[in-house]
Design a protein with these regions (language model features):
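Structured alpha/beta reader/binder surfaces that contact nucleic acids or chromatin modification marks
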Residues: 1-182
Length: 182
């Protein structure tokens, strides 16, 4: 049985990934998997109406919401994480952060990464490759995750998205068989 990762990403960052602008996802932790591994993109639910509107065609941005409405609360695609890079921002001078230098591939400035990770703390840049966008987004319960239960540890249908990321069984694996053998 091969593991993959379900990663929760806010709508505005999913849009940048789908546009090809964001090729490095910054996280505080990383999975205990050898690269390359598959990641499923869960687009989180929006905080405001229409915040999860993701443009799939240029013309859609002038006529929303419509058929191009795509997003929150669903798995919208997948990618292969082929490299995980260590990321660490250290700053002793606030003036150095004022320039707001963007870290390549992240769509984030060094200041934003510093605020997210903390001064001198290491994070990880998950490199996005082989991006596939689903024609029809998938519900979270169509994926299977590992969970502790009354009957012990086993693989079960997901009923909620992970806070950051979590392990799932890749599509094509027999989830029912693994539940019986867990």
């Amino acid at each position: 049985m091969e593991r993959a990762v379900m990663i929760s990403i806010r709508p505005e960052w999913v849009q940048k990934i789908l546009d090809g602008k964001k090729t490095l996802e910054v996280r505080k932790s990383r999975p205990k998997l050898e690269t390359p591994f598959k990641c499923y993109i869960y687009c989180t639910k929006p905080k405001r109406k229409y915040e999860d509107y993701i443009v799939t065609e240029w013309d859609d941005c002038f006529d929303w919401p419509n058929e191009g409405f795509f997003g929150g609360g669903l798995v919208v695609g997948e990618f292969v994480c082929d490299v995980i890079l260590p990321i660490q921002i250290e700053c002793s001078s606030p003036a150095a952060l004022e320039a707001g230098i963007e870290v390549p591939g992240t769509c984030l400035t060094d200041r934003e990464i510093l605020e997210y990770l903390g001064n001198g703390k290491q994070g990880f840049g998950w490199h996005i490759s082989n991006l596939q966008i689903y024609d029809t987004p998938k519900p979270i319960n169509s994926f299977t995750c590992i969970r502790e239960g009354i009957d012990g540890t086993g693989w079960w249908p997901m009923d909620r998205a992970p806070q950051s990321w979590g392990y799932v069984i890749t599509e094509g694996d027999d989830a029912d068989e693994s539940r019986r053998n867990a």
